[in-house]
Design a protein with these regions (language model features):
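Acidic interhelical loop/turn segments
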Residues: 93-107
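Motif-centric detector for short Cys/His coordination patterns
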Residues: 1-91, 108, 114-115, 121-125
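Long amphipathic alpha-helical coiled-coil segments
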Residues: 125-131
Length: 131
């Protein structure tokens, strides 16, 4: 099978599992005991209007707050930085020489790495000016 990456935009607010149960957001037949009722999570509303509840840990791993332009810049900087670190490690490890055969593509990868670094610096400057 092939790999796919998907992203979706949602609305969410903090909510306990007990509150989610009271609002009918849990799976039918799922009744939390007193301990689980206190468990923190999020009330989630999808673009198609479907609403559900998600435990905090998987929600916070999958979603990042993107309410303001500053939030979105910080997400962009974090994502680009992650890709930059991987590319720089690939280039510096010598694996690039094993995988990429021609000098032109090696040069393009190095230019891409430099451009990503410059873009991260630009985003960081904009973020600092927005604080």
């Amino acid at each position: 099978m092939k790999k796919y990456i998907g992203t979706k935009q949602i609305e969410a607010e903090p909510m306990t599992m007990g509150e989610a149960y009271e609002r009918g957001l849990l799976q039918v037949g799922r009744v939390p005991d007193a301990e689980y009722a206190k468990r923190m999570g999020y009330h989630v509303k999808y673009a198609d209007g479907y609403e559900s509840w998600s435990p905090a840990e998987p929600f916070e791993e999958a979603y990042k707050l993107a309410d303001t332009s500053l939030d979105r810049m910080q997400i962009e900087a974090e994502e680009v930085n992650g890709r930059y670190v991987k590319l720089a490690a690939f280039i510096d490890s010598g694996k690039m020489d094993e995988v990429v055969n021609d000098m032109y593509n090696k040069c393009l990868l190095e230019m891409q790495c430099c451009t990503m670094f410059d873009y991260i610096r630009l985003l960081d400057t904009r973020i600092q000016l927005s604080l």
